[in-house]
Every structure is written in structure tokens, then in C-alpha cells.
Amino acid sequence: MSDSNGEMQTTAGAEGVKLNGLFAHKMGMSSVYGDNGESIPVTVLKMETWLVSQVKTKEKDGYSAIQLASRPKKAVNSSQAEKGHLKAAGFENGAHFVKEIRQAIPEGVQLGQRVAIGSIAKGDIVRVTSRSKGKGFAGSVKRHGFAGGPAAHGSKFHRQPGSSGNRTWPGRVMPGKRFPGHLGAETVTVRNVRVVEVLPAEGIILVKGPVPGARNTLVKLVKE
């Protein structure tokens, strides 16, 4: 259920249910100092309220997973199917984000339970998945790292991709040939990322190094 301010009212306790991962939004980058005084570059992630919206089982759905939902929608933006599916989780009018984490079913998990930020702890090694920044249409030099031609005055080409054909046989462009095209805006996964700090009161998670995507990008963290 949601109150007059649009904030979610959860039915679970303060701790919530712990899963093998969670979802958070990228806020930006910063740096913190380690125990030995070293400066550690970190990405700041903010976790909102996520509620369990469905428990998928291998017998019924073909695989085990916990479906989660967050950020309530307005009634005008929701379909009847969405309202019916998420009503049991406490969303009267659907949710902007509906995601899932594949894992074994935790004991005692119920619809409407809040996901605990303690699902991820300091020192954990996680797999980070998010949507990379979209760069628009890009040439082969920027998109694939082609060397390009000489930068001399006498050169007739500089950043052109060059010949893409072949000989008489096969007489066609082979599948997978690298061409100019849309760069970015694709799902990227970074593995072996260390969790530097977790601040439960603020809903903040600090992970070492950069995370793909722009600010406010939804990020999935799963324990390795």
C-alpha cells in the first residue's frame, strides 16, 4: 500500500527478506579512504523500497526466482493486468520497475515483504549489471577501435572503415563484420566488483570502481 505522499508502506519487519542480490540506482562516483589510508574510487548506489511481488517455482514456472517491484505508478499509467498482478504485493496501481533475481526460494518469503539492504554486505564480491550510456551513431574508429588511416596531408582517408567486401569468392560481406552503428545503450555486466561499504540507514551502497550507465541508471547486484 502507499500513503498520501506516494511512499510505500511495507508489511515486513525492519530487516526485510535477504536475497542473493538486489537492485539500486546509480547516483554518481566519489572516493573514500581505506583502513590503510589509500584512496578508493567508489560508485554510490541508492536502494529504494523493493517489495516481493511474485515467488516463481521450478514446478510452476520452470525456474526458481524472486520477482521484485518498486516505485508505484499512477492509476492512469497502469493496465488492469498489471494492477491485478501487483495488488497482492501492495501496489494498487502497478509499479514502474518489475525485476527478478534467480535463486533458490528463501524460507518464509511472502508477497509484500521488503528486500533488506543487508542482502549485500561489506566485503562481498558481486556481479554488477546495468545499461551502458547511449552514444548514438558512431563510426568504426570510435565504436570498434579501428586505427584509421595516416594523419598526413597526402592521405586520402582518415577515419573511414575501408573495404568491407571480399574476393570473387565468397563475394559477400561475412556475418559479424564490424561496421559503424549505434554505440552503447546495451546491457553490460562487470564481474568481481567489491562492496566497499553499506549504509543501511541511508540506503547507500558503495562499490569499488566505475559502474556502467549514467546517473539514475538501475543497477543489479548479485553475489558471485
Region roles according to the model:
Residues 2-224:
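Extended basic (Lys/Arg/His-rich) segments that typically form rRNA-contacting surfaces
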